[in-house]
């Protein structure tokens, strides 16, 4: 199990990213736009730099829903490889069977 503080920190980051996604994407569009004046671009850059770092989606890290483990994460199931193996062997994941050939 991951520390509860690590899981809570990641959840807080996800909330911040979701809340500020629109504003951040609008500012990035202004910075990348060719039709906007340099002064407006500079103001957009300054606004982006003033935003909290945790509002950036780059800082998010996928974690297992059951244990909070940050490594060995399977995107399709949103759990770690260890939990996946346990659940698959117990038949708790529909459609997943052990391979045999």
UniProtKB/Swiss-Prot annotation:
GO terms for molecular function: rRNA binding; structural constituent of ribosome. GO terms for cellular component: cytoplasm; small ribosomal subunit. InterPro entries: Ribosomal_uS14, Ribosomal_uS14_bac/plastid, Ribosomal_uS14_CS. This is Small ribosomal subunit protein uS14. The keyword Ribonucleoprotein applies. Binds 16S rRNA, required for the assembly of 30S particles and may also be responsible for determining the conformation of the 16S rRNA at the A site. It comes from Chlamydia pneumoniae (Chlamydophila pneumoniae). Pfam families: Ribosomal_S14 (PF00253). Belongs to the universal ribosomal protein uS14 family. One of its GO terms (biological process) is translation. The keyword Amino-acid biosynthesis does not apply. Keywords: Ribonucleoprotein, Ribosomal protein, RNA-binding, rRNA-binding. HAMAP family: Ribosomal_uS14_1 (MF_00537). Gene3D superfamilies: 1.10.287.1480. Part of the 30S ribosomal subunit. Contacts proteins S3 and S10.
């Amino acid at each position: 199990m991951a520390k509860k503080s690590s899981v809570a920190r990641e959840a807080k980051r996800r909330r911040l990213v979701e809340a500020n996604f629109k504003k951040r994407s609008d500012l990035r569009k202004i910075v990348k736009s060719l039709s906007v004046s340099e002064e407006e671009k500079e103001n957009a850059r300054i606004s982006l730099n003033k935003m909290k770092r945790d509002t950036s989606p780059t800082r998010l890290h996928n974690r297992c829903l059951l244990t909070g483990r940050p490594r060995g994460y399977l995107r399709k199931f949103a759990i770690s490889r260890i939990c996946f193996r346990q659940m698959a062997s117990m038949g708790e994941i529909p459609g997943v069977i052990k391979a045999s050939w």
